[in-house]
């Protein structure tokens, strides 16, 4: 990299819209008014025959409301007597297990450093960590695989983690049918007594294009080498992609039949989503992860973020690819100014308000990353990316919300990002804001307040599957309290075990067994405390969920942190520190790219087939691009953003029309009706041809996420 290029990535003036303040002062003023509005008081009276709001004489002592009521703890003497002794015993045992776990991990670290990584393999391994782009990293990974003899493993079809016999036969069948179909297309000759080869090809594709068919998407198949997977698995992926492209281009099948074919494949195969976890300033590692995926054209269109990850997700979802390539550089640190206040300032604020940071100042700083008061629907129409932000209500018993352009299209993104980052003691709960038809802001969802989504749903996998059929998740996990306990005893994707040619156990079988036992025992006792309602609720929050929820996905990226990150956990990064975090984020994503590429090869081929064959008009859903063209906007040629916009499967969005969305906004904003109620009213005017059970399930589930109930397990 030249000196001018290096200087450019550190120059804040090279950032797009660096000096531009997107948010209007009136938006901040309305947000401040919404925060200061008093909660609506219910009608109260001493009894049925006294007047309401009668003046009541104050008692001398202030009565504290109980943390838990009898509805939760039930009545009983033993609960009161045994609660605190049992809680002390369990917490003491968990502390002992924690110390034992740290010692076990230290033993495994020493074992790997002094037994496994020695000699030439150590020097080749060091080359992986100094590469700045995926091409050079892949060369270094292939050299390490060649030294360890991993290429021989790729050539052998047999493996316990997938059905190699079925895949081998299937590849041969697909290749033969594709060649026959190509011959028929070029010579335009089809035997009248037989069906075209392309129809037989479609039949086989409908049987095999499914999520993790025959185990070909098992992460274990990518966890025994540093680069790539089995040759047979790679041949299968490439052959399926070629067959899908052939079907889309074939003239022997009508567009309507091809559309239904690709729609069926899409339903079975599902979608891919990028999930960015919370973690305070650890979330800046996400910039490097996103940069690595963007540079290699494997950045999914569905993105979800929580807490600090929501800020990164908002930046990604509101910018185009070209803008992101200019923004994801160390100079971005000059725009991260949320923690610039001194010690005395935030101590006084915390003593006065119970929160370290000022909500209005954070709203002003956050608005630049969200391009002002952009809504979820406006971001989707601008970039084609689907942004999701997880928020938790202040009431510990209410369900969480996954805000996106379907559940809350007119919700302002920066308000959702603030709510998702409102950790108790750091930032007070926040009111979500919605944009009305005239462009002004108003409180959303009856003015209820929301807080940090990481407290209950850091990775909202269930809601993503419900709304967008997501069944393949790429999780970038940076929560510091979770990274300590992440341990893959049999290796991870692109990170095989260091000895026995990747077929052994980390730290030996004994070390891995002890680690697993201690970790599972700690998890068991935490669940016991939660189910027996023994844990206190500081600040009105059940803190057990920050340990017991699921934090991983199909592919989990764990950026490597350093001890100084804990010291700067609530501090703005310098350009030099952000440069290191971006580099480490890229390094952690490089081993996963080949796995993600193979997944997206098939997914993008299906989406492209849907785009090419989708009927125009006819009462079907309208994509945002078609909507703009129909209304006289954007009469020029379709650009790549519009092309990607049409690929986001509009058939899942229901009747996507401007009139329907305007009615939804009017009802939600002016009448105080939330989007779920507005959707129900809309459905009453336009009934769908679904069964009663499906319709009731869709209406009840469209707004809420991750309900802890057995009824959701079958979805």
UniProtKB/Swiss-Prot annotation:
GO cellular component: lipid droplet; membrane
Keyword Lipid metabolism part of the UniProt annotation: yes
Similarity comment: family membership: Belongs to the PLPL family.
Chief localization: membrane
Function in brief: Probable lipid hydrolase.
Membrane topology annotation: Single-pass membrane protein
Region (Disordered): 613-715
Spans traversing the lipid bilayer: 84-104
Location(s), subcellular: Membrane
Organism (species): Aspergillus terreus (strain NIH 2624 / FGSC A1156)
InterPro entries: Acyl_Trfase/lysoPLipase (IPR016035), NTE (IPR050301), PNPLA_dom (IPR002641), Triacylglycerol_lipase_N (IPR021771)
CDD domains noted in UniProt: Pat_PLPL (cd07232)
Lineage start: Eukaryota, Fungi, Dikarya, Ascomycota, Pezizomycotina
Biased composition, class Basic and acidic residues, residue ranges: 652-661
Transmembrane keyword on record: yes
GXSXG, short sequence motif: residues: 305-309
Signal sequence, renumbered to the chain: none
Biased composition (Polar residues): 665-678
GO molecular function, one term: triacylglycerol lipase activity
Disulfide bonds: none
Active site, renumbered: 307 (nucleophile), 452 (proton acceptor)
Top-level taxonomic group: Eukaryota
EC number: 3.1.1.-
Keywords: Hydrolase, Lipid degradation, Lipid metabolism, Membrane, Transmembrane, Transmembrane helix
Protein name, UniProt field: Patatin-like phospholipase domain-containing protein ATEG_02594
GO biological process, one term: lipid catabolic process
